[in-house]
Each structure stands twice: as C-alpha cells, then as structure tokens.
Amino acid sequence: MSVNGPGVVVITGGSAGLGRALALSYCAPGITLGLIGRNAERLEAVAAECRARGAEIVTGYLDVRDAAALQAWIFDFDAQHPIDLLIANAGVASTLRSSDDWEGAGRTAEVVDTNLYGALHAVLPAIERMRDRRRGQIAIVSSLAGLRGMAISPAYCVSKAALLAYCDSVRPVLARDHIGISVVMPGFVRTAMSDVFPGNKPFMWSAEKAALFIKKRLTRRRVQIAFPFSLTLGLKLLRLLPATVADAILGLLFQIPRRNM
C-alpha cells in the first residue's frame, strides 16, 4: 500500500451497480484490481473499462456462495498481488411482493447465503493473508437497513445487520495486526438492486457518487461509512423510539402489501 492509497484492490460483486462504480473509481495506472462476479459478460465489460484507464485487471467468474472456490481464487491472487484492500460488495435484495407473499426458508437462506456468508467467504481468506503480513484493509458493504429492520424485507435486513455486528466484533482483534475493517452502510443507490424495493426511495444517490464517497472515507480508514446523512440520522433516531412507534413510521415510508381478509 502506497502513501497515496491501496495499490491492489479486490472487489466482489464487481460486474454492475455499486461494484462497477467502485472499480472505476479505483482504476488507474499502477493499480491492480481483482474483480469478482458471476456474470462473465458484464464482468469483462467492466474489466475492459478499467483496463482502458490503465489499471491491471484480474477477473474471477465466481459465485461468492462457493466458499472453496472463492478462497482458492483469493489465495492465488494474493500470492501474486498481495491485497491491500478487499471490498466485499456482492449482494442480493429481497422484498415482499404481494399481500400473500412471505420469505420462507428457501428465500431467506438464499439472501443470507449471498449477503452474509458470501461476504465472509471473501474476507476470511483475505484476513488470513493480511494477518501474516500484519497489514491490510477490509470493507464490507452492509446497508442502512442493517440499523433497523423493515417489515418489507426481513431477510435482507437480517443479513445486513449481521454484517454490521461482525465488523464491530472483529475490529479490535484485527487492529492488533494493523488491519482496518470498515462497514459501509449505503441508503438507496440507483442500481438494479434498488429497483427491487417498491415505494419511496428517499435521498437516492447515484452509484458514482456513492463510490467516490466510500473511497474517500476508506482512504481515511473510517470504521463506519453511512450515507446519506439525513436517512442515517433518521434510522438511528428510530432505534430510540418504542418499537411500535418505529414500526408505524417505517410502515408509512415503506408500505408492505396489505392482505385482503
């Protein structure tokens, strides 16, 4: 890692949305990017954009739910390009779609496997190598939904809340080995993923604006990166209210489908 920032960056979920915007924000001559994604065509398109800006790109067509494959790729990549910064960004969204909808075991497991375990499958191998070097930086993309559960997306909220708790838990331990870990908590970002959520999307940011905001604060090694400010403050204040009052307020903002009796 140079004084100007990380020279080697790995980003999961790098083929679209926020991951693509992050890749483009970091790519420059002298930078090596490891981009991981499931869609080979889209990932290669992002890689081509980054190469055009002078960065060295290594792609991995992987599903983050495949722990063994992801660990093998990260170990192999790190052996050639010691990772300065890993951004665990891959994720999926899920919401209740109708009055009779319910997130059962299958849907809940799919979301948790990708958002929670997929992130851990990426960061744990990287941390292992960073601890050997006694340096490095990890960023995990959670969500403001991790601050307070919403009835419209239970599985998504629990997966993101778990990431926040994980970062808080391991931060003091990793600090002993000079490894920083940051939790990124975006609000609504204009991507295909946000299209899954119906109704109001207050204070929505573009992916490009979000990526630059995140990069700037990762450079400063901020432990929590939450945005936008108004929505962050509102959700933190909701946690101080009685649960029934907070539920009612969120119900007005993010209406769940009503069931006809």
Residue ranges and their predicted role:
Residues 52-68:
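Rossmann-fold cofactor-recognition segment
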Residues 183, 199-234:
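C-terminal helical subdomain
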